[in-house]
């Protein structure tokens, strides 16, 4: 087996775990950075596929709860829009972000 493949695979899996858990990045941002580093798309897909969906969703909720404390807005809609924009900047997928934000009590 090619050494580069094994190292890329290990690197991608560790990168995904670290960025989701410590940095609070979403799948889109992680994918972009791994592509920039020259990791094969199949390896990226495999590494991202090992992410626990429920834990990923909970991480997004935690991030938004923290951010909600500092967001200033004139209306509930505006606050939710700002929270959604923040989550998408961190690389979370739009449909998931809006699903979570709609449930939010601001």
Predicted regions and their residues:
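An alpha-helical, amphipathic repeat domain used for nucleic-acid recognition
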Residues: 1-106
